[in-house]
């Protein structure tokens, strides 16, 4: 099964990056641009909303939340996202930096949709990076590069 992989260096402490990924308010700041519903603690479920949608684009279950790793299992979402696993691995880098290893694993097959998702993940991870470093985020729709209708 193919996976989406990204590696990002962030000039911010692991704890700050973790907080932006592990809580629904943080996720909204760098990714969705609007509030999530549910809870992002271990075992929790949260819905991801974009634009003016009434229904979540995806529902995630938090399967890991440690200082060095956060994982979400996709329980609802676009067909090819179902049952995939999104993992953020955080490692200290230097005195105050973080290396983020991102994996969106378990895709059934490589596809044009998957490549577009990879492009957008790169943009949203850049939003996470710049937000953690400077407080300036570019969530959806500003951060979206590849549009799917």
Where does each model-flagged region fall?
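Hydrophobic ligand-binding cavity/cleft-lining segments
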Residues: 1-37
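Beta-strand/loop substructures that line and gate deep hydrophobic ligand-binding cavities in soluble
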Residues: 75-130, 139-141
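Glycine-rich portal/gate segments that line the openings of hydrophobic small-molecule binding cavities
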Residues: 37-76
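Intrinsic-disorder/low-complexity, polar/charged segments enriched in Ser/Thr/Lys/Arg/Asp/Glu/Gln
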Residues: 3-7, 45, 57, 69, ...
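A short, structured loop/turn motif at beta-sheet edges
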Residues: 14-15, 63-68, 89-99
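Hydrophobic/aromatic beta-strand elements that line small-molecule binding cavities or substrate pockets
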Residues: 8, 58-64, 84-92
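Acidic/histidine-enriched, glycine/proline-rich intrinsically disordered or flexible terminal extensions
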Residues: 136-149
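Hydrophobic pocket/interface hotspot
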Residues: 17-18, 27, 46, 62, ...
């Amino acid at each position: 099964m193919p996976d989406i992989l990204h590696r990002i260096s962030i000039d911010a402490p692991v704890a700050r990056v973790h907080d932006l990924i592990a809580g629904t308010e943080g996720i909204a700041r760098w990714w969705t641009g609007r509030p999530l519903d549910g809870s992002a603690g271990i075992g929790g479920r949260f819905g991801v909303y974009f634009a003016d949608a009434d229904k979540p684009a995806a529902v995630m279950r938090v399967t890991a939340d440690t200082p060095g790793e956060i994982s979400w299992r996709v329980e609802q979402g676009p067909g090819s996202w179902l049952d995939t696993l999104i993992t953020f691995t955080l490692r200290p880098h230097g005195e105050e930096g973080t290396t983020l290893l991102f994996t969106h694993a378990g895709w059934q097959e490589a596809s044009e949709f998957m490549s577009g998702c990879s492009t957008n993940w790169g943009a949203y991870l850049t939003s996470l990076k710049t937000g953690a470093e400077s407080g300036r985020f570019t969530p959806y729709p500003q951060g979206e590069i590849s549009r799917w209708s």
